[in-house]
Amino acid sequence: PAGIDQRSPARHPDWLGPDDLALKIEEIREATDGQIPIQLKLGAARVYDDVRMAAKTGCDSIYIDGMEGGTGAGPLLATEETGVPGIAAIRQARRAIDDVGMTGRISLIYAGGIRNGGDVAKAVALGADAVAIGHSAMMALNCNRDTPEADYEGEMGVKAGECYHCHTGRCTVGVATQDPEL
């Protein structure tokens, strides 16, 4: 709501630790009749310890997001200056999954700064089972391109190329909206 600070990263109110998380995963699995894979997404911070804990919860995959990823939701200091570089996070995450005996049962997915095939090859060579491409794919779709009809500073309050209004449904280039006019 307007005037209320957003908490980013957000905290889920239903769990405070690994035991609560395992219960929540079981609850979701029951609600979906086990038909939907359950993935945990973790920011790369205390990678080894966090992944070890996550691997014991019953999830199907663990998604590690390195500090090179992008989000319009967090303060600039958090998005640009915190976290573990992704390449270092992959080895720690793979070792944690291996150490708890979940190799082959839990997939390791990595995202954060994947820009090209070389980055994909490095991630897989270091132990990722798959990679996710977010920001690069958005840029390839022309996200944040300057459009002559958009008054970014007047309408959005930001300069062209710094929109980050994906969550509003007002994407002026049409990448993150369901509005046919945009």
Identify the meaning behind each predicted range.
Residues 1-3:
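Flexible glycine-/small-residue-enriched beta->alpha junction loops
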Residues 9-181:
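Glycine-rich phosphate/ribose-binding loops and adjacent secondary-structure elements
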